[in-house]
Regions:
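Positively charged n-region of N-terminal signal peptides that target proteins for export
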Residues: 1-4, 19
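C-terminal motif of bacterial Sec signal peptides marking the signal peptidase cleavage site
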Residues: 14-16
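Buried hydrophobic residues that stabilize the cores of well-folded domains
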Residues: 18-267
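Sec-dependent signal peptide hydrophobic core
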Residues: 5-9
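Hydrophobic alpha-helical membrane-insertion segments
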Residues: 11-12, 246
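Compositionally biased, proline/threonine/alanine/serine-rich low-complexity intrinsically disordered stretches
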Residues: 10-11, 267
Length: 267
């Protein structure tokens, strides 16, 4: 599920038309994760560090787990994700592959230095997703996804999930406004809703609220998370974000560092 959400976001989990003016005129790349996220500048990597919040709502000690680092190619598409602890020890890593048009086509995952699975997505000659196959840590086929549809920005709109024995398990349906993810619904094999989510944004395209509702036979649980953006860099990209629960209590502060490509590196 983690990988299909990543694919859905285009990262993962992200892809709109590349609007960079200095790309080659004959480039086949149509999609860009960074453009989808409405981030500005030629970003090479993004590092997010989470911090605890004290009783007064001020930033406290750094969380021991986990610092996340996303690396991007020259087209603004994610090619590697790394999670490490406060000492810099890598805990998990995912290396992504991309289609020539920029679509996310798979990941090879490791955890604590050992294989933890992979995913490969097939793209047809029209540049459309067709099938997504996962493998477990031993390389054996695991769950797979069919009936994958996508929007004009290369983001996954819907899919059907089957287990390794080809038994239909669940399906998902996403909703977007242009390239902004607005919500997602999953249903079980008989069509009953399992979960729904919804997102809200400010006028900069920054997510300010995310709600997730989980439905079981006996209970329905909704979790609402809200965000404020405290600081931005000179390009307008946020560098500090505070997270709140549904009661308005600050629960986490994330500091973000961008590495931008130097002009000479683009030549």
């Amino acid at each position: 599920m983690k990988r299909i959400l990543m694919l859905m976001a285009g990262v993962f989990l992200l892809a709109s038309c590349n609007n960079s003016g200095d790309k080659a005129a004959d480039s086949k790349v149509k999609y860009s994760d960074l453009a989808n996220d409405q981030l500005k500048g030629d970003i090479e990597s993004i590092e997010d560090t989470p911090y605890q919040v004290d009783s007064t709502g001020k930033m406290g000690a750094m969380d021991s787990c986990c610092i996340s680092v996303n690396q991007y190619d020259a087209n603004g598409n994610a090619i590697k994700f790394t999670s490490k602890d406060s000492k810099g020890t890598v805990k998990s890593e995912s290396v992504f592959t991309r289609h020539e048009n920029g679509l996310w086509t798979g990941a090879t995952d490791t955890k604590d230095g050992k294989s933890s699975g992979s995913m490969k997505v097939t793209v047809d000659d029209k540049g459309q997703y067709t099938l997504a196959q996962t493998t477990d840590s031993t390389g054996k086929p695991d769950i797979y996804y069919t009936n994958i549809t996508q929007n004009e920005f290369g983001q996954v709109l819907s899919w059907k999930e089957y287990d390794k024995d080809s038994v239909f398990r669940q399906e998902g349906q996403g909703k977007y406004e242009k390239s902004l993810f607005m919500g997602f619904t999953t249903k079980d094999s008989v069509g009953k809703v399992k979960s729904t989510s919804a997102a809200k944004y400010n006028d900069k395209g920054e997510q300010i609220e995310f709600s997730n509702t989980t439905i079981t036979k006996d209970t329905t649980t909704t979790k609402v998370t809200k965000y404020t953006y405290d600081t931005h860099d000179d390009k307008g990209n946020w560098t500090q974000r505070t997270e709140y629960d549904d009661k308005g209590k600050a629960t986490k502060i994330t500091k973000r560092v961008y590495t931008y490509r130097k002009e000479e590196a683009k030549k």
